[in-house]
Amino acid sequence: MDNDLYLSKKNSIERCLARIKQELETGSDPLSNITHMDAVVLNLQRACEIAIGIAMHAISHHKLGLPQTSRDAFQILTDAGVLSEDLGLRLKKMVGFRNVAVHDYQSVTPKILGLVLRDHLNDFNEFLSALERKWPFPPPIK
């Protein structure tokens, strides 16, 4: 993957995570306010989409296969040893959350969102770190 593209996408994920943390630090319970909850879900959705895009680009660039679905992308990276089994599974579940957020928003309850925020917000950073361990950025000068 082109280094500038990767860094731009990484920066976008970091902005989404910062925005989520900003909403969580408002002092009140952001999950009890629909406007704050919407901001959190929207930024989670954005971070998910960007992570999927990074995965697809990495697979294409390194000729690892041809994913048929977003979940396939994380499975291919797991099979290639880029992601641990555990992280690959969590990222595939993230795709499921993204699908629910996009297509069945009403079922994203404050309780479910709270669990995602508590247990899985760092999955994005773990994903980026795993990619950077496998393919250090910036690439060596040839």
Describe each region flagged by the PLM:
Residues M1-K142:
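Solvent-exposed interaction patches of small proteins and small membrane subunits
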